[in-house]
Amino acid sequence: MTIGHLVSVSKEHEMVNPIFADFIAGASARYAQSGYDLLHSLVPDEDEFTSYKELAARSAVDGVVVHAPRVDEQRIAQLNNLNLPFVVHGRSSNTVEKYNWVDVNNERSFFRATQLLIELGHRSIGLINGVAEMDFAMRRTRGYRRALKENNIAVAEAYITHSEMTEPNGYKNAITLLDLPTPPTAIVTSSIIMANGIRRALDERELKLGRDVSVITHDDDLSYFRDPAAVPVYTATRSSVREAGRLSADLLLKTIADPGRDPEGILLDAELILGSSTKPPRPR
């Protein structure tokens, strides 16, 4: 008995991404308890659906987990047509199909993060986000924009960047924002990995995290980056991706055991954890 996790070649780096690794750690513990093996497969982007069809035809897997869903996600309808049990880690906003999913409330998380910065007195707030086509990134942008709108703050499009969530991209995008004629006094970012890149950019410009530029990050509670300090370095919206892996596995195993059950969605709320990276803006 086997559960499949297919990763496209364009997302090959995800195989060593600590977010993916922690998700797999949570899921695989559940698989092992239920007697299932885990299959990782790296496939060309254009052959991803073909790979699903071949796995289903050969009965090579009992179910699959879909990673990194886009706003417009074709894999969901394709898998429903194959009658192959699956669960999506995340959601796809433009998909009308019914499907199993586990997701964090991304819009609410980034609304709360932006609202906190506004309450501290910030009016120039940047957003360093994930790839725009990804559903989580779209929802986080929506939460950020909604907080600004509800506080009558104009959205500065130059303050919004999208890229893959790596440390170098966090650094590069932070430099772009810091080089603006009126740089933001605060930044919200989608990953603690990117936050570390932002911090490197601040250090390079001899700016102090929190004092000169406030930063709030989304924190997937990664085992590799866990902060044991009484006051964390970063103020963060925190939701355990390992727990998301466990819940995704539970939901998939239920569906395998009872293929006729109605699809289910699980929405997780992120905690807002106060750290030392957020303070009122300094007078300019």
Tell me the role of every PLM-derived stretch.
Residues T2, P85, S124, T185-A186:
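Residues that mark the start of a beta-strand
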Residues T2-Q115, E119, L177-D179, I193, ...:
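Alpha-helical recognition/docking segments in bacterial nutrient-uptake
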Residues V9-A21, H40-F49, V102-R112, I128-N173, ...:
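Hinge/beta->alpha junction and helix N-cap segments in small-molecule ligand-binding domains
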Residues G26-R30, Q78, R139-N151, G197-R205:
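Alpha-helical structural signal in soluble globular domains
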Residues V61-H67, G126-I128, I160, P181-S191, ...:
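Periplasmic-binding protein-like
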Residues R123, A154-A156, K208:
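Conserved H-loop
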Residues I175, L180-R284:
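Flexible loop/turn connectors
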